[in-house]
Regions:
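Hydrophobic alpha-helical segments
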Residues: 1-169
Length: 169
């Protein structure tokens, strides 16, 4: 595969510098994903902004990780799965939920399992859930807002998972 450039805050295009500098300050390092995305500042900035928007969604941190880790697994992104395992642990996601998300096993919590199943459906149908898929999601206590937020989470993971695939981060 092509050896993609991994930028530092010093080598990044000007439009990418603020995100890399923010990551360096917050984490103490620049993740390889960000360093790679910096080559296309629009991608890096879109990814960072989508992440901020997802954090403002109606989903709890655990629900966010259900959507994100489900997409990581379905998209075969080991890098993101490892990163989100660490994020999930730091966010207080129960260990049994993390294990289920990593392996694709059902989650014991019925509402979280409904979310996982719906995230699978959105990913595998490329956004074409059936009415019965929607009805099952609604019956679990979710609404139209959460349908759209699953799409947001799925889009967020497409950016990172696909970047990791082509750049082998």
């Amino acid at each position: 595969m092509t050896d993609f450039t991994r930028h530092t805050p010093e080598t990044a295009p000007a439009a990418a510098k603020p995100v890399l500098e923010g990551a360096q300050k917050a984490l103490g390092f620049v993740p390889n994903l960000y360093a790679t995305m910096a080559e296309a500042p629009a991608l890096l900035n879109a990814y960072a902004q989508l992440g901020e928007l997802l954090n403002k969604s109606s989903f709890s941190p655990t629900e966010q990780q259900v959507v994100l880790m489900t997409n990581n697994r379905l998209n075969g992104c080991d890098y993101c799965m490892a990163a989100h395992t660490t994020i999930s642990q730091a966010s207080g996601v129960p260990a049994d939920v993390i294990d289920a998300l990593r392996t694709g096993a059902p989650i014991a919590d019925a509402k979280l399992e409904a979310l996982r199943q719906f995230a699978i459906t959105v990913n595998e149908t490329r956004g074409w859930p059936t009415q019965s898929d929607l009805d099952a999601f609604f019956a679990a206590g979710y609404g139209q807002q959460q349908v759209l937020e699953v799409i947001l989470g799925t889009a967020f993971k497409v950016l990172s998972n696909y970047t990791n695939h082509v750049a082998s981060t």
